[in-house]
Amino acid sequence: MLGSKPASGRSRERIELLVVGALTIDRFPDGSAAPGGSVLHATRAAARARASVTVITAAGGEPETQEALRELRSMATVVLEETAHTLVFEHDERGGRRELSLLGNVRLRPDVRQLQRMRPRVILLAPVAGELDAVALRTIDEAVETRVRVAALQGWLRRREADGRLMPNVLADLPQAVLAELRNCDAVVVSHEDLGGDDAAPDATAALEVRRSLPGPGVLVTYGRAGYVRGVPEARQPTVVRRRETIDGVPTVGAGDGFAAVVAIQLAKGSSLSAAARSADAAVERWLARQPGAVRKPLPS
């Protein structure tokens, strides 16, 4: 069970974190491209937190992917499932709204023998497009002994249309076998946008929605620069945490993945979900504040 405070001597201990998810290539309207994926952003945050990281990922041989793998290998031990092509996200702006399309298809199939040799203190499940199906989740669950499991839900909450466009997927509509595996997690992290919400300020409704489908884990729903909502099984109502000020003028790509990684690390140290979320929020804020052009601004009360 998760503790309410760090065990003696563990606050400075290097936590062994296993991150699982596919790499991506992001292509933008101006023709540029960059490596991406929750596994990359989460590993960067874990490295900043001085965790010892192992990554299980899938990717092809494109130049952007090789760049990402070089970076990952500088921060973590990498177990690679080679695929014909890396998943590609195409970004588009239409009528002032951003649209995302997906090219390719990946299903991660971690090797049981490799998994059984791993002894992570915590696992972060971080798919980008459903590559962790019930088979993969069950394999990981049965093969890896670990104290804490955390899932970043984004990759399960994307539904691909016939033309490749990605639309929000309803959590309750996921396969029951996937939901059953996710209910075994200690915590789940998701943004309100991935849940299909457009509220600017944190609201308890989204966390209640997640808890209806996943009543077991602690729930953290992030609201970008505005704050987050925290829900735990033993509390009837979620707790809304609003920021008093925000970091503006810099992109927040990867911030949610970094938040999830630090939450996972802190839970593995024995922190409560409340303390883990505070640490993660502060870590993301420090990271954003160091970016060129970052400006602190008060938020409306």
Name every feature range the model reports, one short phrase each.
Residues L2-R14, D173-Q176, P202-S301:
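Conserved phosphate-binding/catalytic region of the ribokinase-like
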Residues V122-A206, A226-G227:
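Conserved beta-alpha-beta core of the PfkB/ribokinase-like small-molecule kinase fold
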Residues V55, D186-A187, G218:
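Well-ordered beta-strand positions
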Residues R44, V88-H91, G227-G231:
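Short beta-strand scaffold segments in enzyme catalytic cores
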Residues A22-L23, G258:
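Active-site metal-binding loops of divalent metal-dependent hydrolases
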Residues R10-L17, T24-A33, R48-V150, S301:
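Conserved N-terminal subdomain of the carbohydrate kinase-like
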Residues P29-P35, A162-G164, D199-P202, Q291:
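Short, solvent-exposed loop/turn segments at secondary-structure boundaries
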Residues T43-S52, I265-K269:
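Alpha-helix C-terminal capping segments
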